[in-house]
């Protein structure tokens, strides 16, 4: 899966999670199954949004709002791999209301950081008809604009109707969504935001019109400060309001909160007991002299307590909050969702509290502050991704220290049990993909079958289900033929998808959730005769992939230093791609956090020709310490171990375009693919023949 992150991103198939077992989350009552059905029932894009915008503008007028903005950043394609987590789902649902002054915007991100991507997609699609995973929709009384990044330029152009202006993020001369919003809010207009959907920042006031913060949210945008500063340049200002206009639009039709069962991730797969993890967190609190940590990020809670849920499609998390002090651990969750095993798992070690009581509990915590015997400063630790409303409940900045969550860093470093689980599940998943590609080629070429993109995705799911420890997909399968492959986060729908063309490129980006790990693999194939340019583009992408796989770098290196390894060959030809080269914990390319041994990341360069084809080649890799002849500065050096086991397409491989070293890399890789996966097909002649052909030396 790919992700665009101009300032933070290699992982972000969100702060991205690499959960080791699958299963989800939210604060307001939303049923993911209902949301998913709604998404599937939506009419094919583009949708005429005239009436929807008119209704929204009526509500804006009633609430004395001139501008309404919704920011959403989540990754449709992001498998939650708690094991490598860095969950960066900005979910949308936002809201606002202002009064006394005319004004503006509701910026939204997500509740609980991890996982309401379906909800966001529905909300964003409802208003704009755009179904991409990242962007910002802004509506004034006379204009509507949608800002998104390069992954979605093509998709947005197709899905937005005439009511909307597309703001291409990162393109010279095009305003950012903050700048565009500031233009709409000039001359003293006030921009309102839901405090549960933004992080606390400077220059923000809380509206005295409401005294109770009702909405719960844990992963919020960190742009409140930036937005406030931008608004000041045009005379606008930013305040927090408690009302959510989207809730008002939904009314009684708002889906109920998920009530899916919560299960235990056994220590045999987690590699570490939750008691040890909680104790490690307490040591961190003691080192920082803090009284407690309030946790709202769903993947962090699931990882910390070795629990898994299924409240969010493809993501093993559940709606919850947690508070950890030097002596007590509290989990705020709907107790009816806990399996008997989960209850026993927590019994006597974790105090269970009602999910909806977190804000009151935070206020009580703030009032009591820290006990004198704790030796702490009395301040509470809060993730810098937590909501402004949660910070306020804890007493604001005088009681709260907002930092990068220590749990995020702990999750990013996999233990040996987790790493071995990743390796094993990739062997099985590689076999499933090999079986699928062999079946697909045979069906298209030998049998002349008419198969569409959804047929392909469904067949892959059927095949994966046969393999041990499979739980479900880790994200929506991107099964795309021809021009659809150029839409980076393409999602085929039965009513609008294309028939797979054997004479066109076929891009398949998919992943599975297994009890012992999560997979994410992309391969691009051709079942006919590719053009010379297609083979050259494929070679350039493969060269970049190999360059990353072979990279050796000193500990402390960030993704910025490595990104050019993947792009250098494309750059020499004047080509590039508009997404991050990878994702994983701690992030990789486009990440500010240095890479560390035992991070799990993706390596996925690509190339996309709009209206024609797309190429992406993705393996997951483990960052590990490597032996070098010297150690400059007595610093260890790191490299990568590729764990994905699926061959590259022989029809697209032109050996003459690769160096001798690159050809050796391909041959060695294919030999390993054959060794690890061929035993699965001893009684499957068709797949064995396909695999033997695709792994032959070049």
Curated annotation (Swiss-Prot):
Keyword check for Hydrolase: yes
Catalytic reactions of this protein: Release of any N-terminal amino acid, including proline, that is linked to proline, even from a dipeptide or tripeptide
Gene Ontology biological process terms from the UniProt entry: proteolysis
EC number: 3.4.11.9
Entry's Gene Ontology cellular component terms: cytoplasm
Binding positions for Mn(2+) 1 per the UniProt entry: 520, 604, 618
Cofactors that this protein relies on: Mn(2+)
Cofactor: how and how many bound: Binds 2 manganese ions per subunit.
Gene Ontology terms, MF aspect: metal ion binding; metalloaminopeptidase activity
Pfam families found in the cross-reference section: Creatinase_N (PF01321), Creatinase_N_2 (PF16189), Peptidase_M24 (PF00557), Peptidase_M24_C (PF16188)
Sorted UniProt keywords: Aminopeptidase, Hydrolase, Manganese, Metal-binding, Metalloprotease, Protease
Principal EC category: hydrolase
Signal peptide, first to last residue: none
Keyword Metal-binding: yes
Family label: Belongs to the peptidase M24B family.
Function: Catalyzes the removal of a penultimate prolyl residue from the N-termini of peptides.
Name assigned to this protein: Probable Xaa-Pro aminopeptidase P
UniProt source species: Arthroderma benhamiae (strain ATCC MYA-4681 / CBS 112371) (Trichophyton mentagrophytes)
